[in-house]
């Protein structure tokens, strides 16, 4: 699999995390690769509030791409660089139920299909790997009590796992440079925000569409004990290093209210 710039940003930063005894868990998505695989099967990707509408054919493709392509590729590259990593399917970590319908832009209720809401987590294996200084590579898949596999929004999955692990920080790598006052203007980046300010921006419509699951999961993580959340542009060279090891940073940081 051709690596993305987001993967490059992660991989170059891992040795520095390990040098400073930082313990890292990777929860990844696979949006573009999944959409490309769906297109090969003549399936059209559709999103509602940042969630991919997932029918029976789609969930099989999503499971295959995440489990057989993206997770192993990330783990292999970490090992090539001298680190230790192990793939863990989200199906063995996240317990989920079918998500309720969402409203589209017209106000119509849309059945999301096999999209799941997380009801609980089992981090036993994740914690063992973290304690052994092995990087867990986790796919955003959940499993129902009946065995049904669900597609989980990766941002939400990361937040739930971070809360369960009592992580200090979550870093989201996306295709934008952070939260912007004007979503179309990358120079309108907001460097620091509080949870209250995030809620205000949502009410004003500044935060909308695909950013909603990201900021909602961030707020939930902060409320659940995570101290800080960072939003970075994974396409920017050295984005993780610049955010974490420079005074100014390059993305948006949201800190829990003390």
Which positions does each model-derived feature cover?
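Nucleotide/pyrophosphate-binding catalytic subdomain
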Residues: 1-235, 242, 248, 255-258
């Amino acid at each position: 699999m051709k690596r993305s710039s987001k993967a490059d940003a992660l991989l170059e930063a891992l040795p520095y995390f390990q040098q400073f005894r930082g313990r890292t868990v990777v929860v990844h998505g696979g949006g573009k690769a999944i959409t490309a695989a769906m297109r090969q099967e003549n399936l059209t990707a559709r999103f509602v509030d940042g969630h991919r509408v997932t029918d029976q054919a789609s969930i099989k493709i999503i499971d295959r791409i995440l489990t057989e392509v993206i997770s192993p590729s990330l783990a292999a590259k970490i090992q090539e660089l001298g680190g230790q990593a192990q793939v863990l399917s989200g199906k063995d970590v996240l317990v989920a139920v079918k998500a309720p319908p969402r409203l589209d832009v017209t106000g119509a209720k849309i059945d999301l299909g096999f999209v799941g809401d997380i009801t609980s987590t089992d981090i036993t294996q994740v914690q063992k790997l973290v304690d052994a200084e092995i990087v867990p590579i986790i796919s955003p898949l959940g499993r129902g009590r009946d065995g049904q596999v669900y597609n989980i929004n990766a941002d939400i999955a990361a937040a739930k796992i971070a809360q369960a692990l009592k992580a200090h920080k979550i870093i989201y790598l996306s295709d934008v440079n952070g939260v912007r006052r004007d979503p179309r203007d990358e120079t309108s980046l907001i460097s620091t925000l509080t949870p209250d300010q995030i809620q205000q921006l949502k009410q004003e419509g500044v935060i909308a569409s695909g950013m909603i699951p990201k900021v909602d999961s961030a707020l939930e993580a902060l409320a659940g004990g995570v101290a800080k959340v960072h939003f970075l542009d994974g396409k920017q060279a050295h984005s993780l290093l610049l955010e974490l090891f420079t005074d100014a940073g390059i993305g948006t940081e949201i800190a829990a209210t003390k």
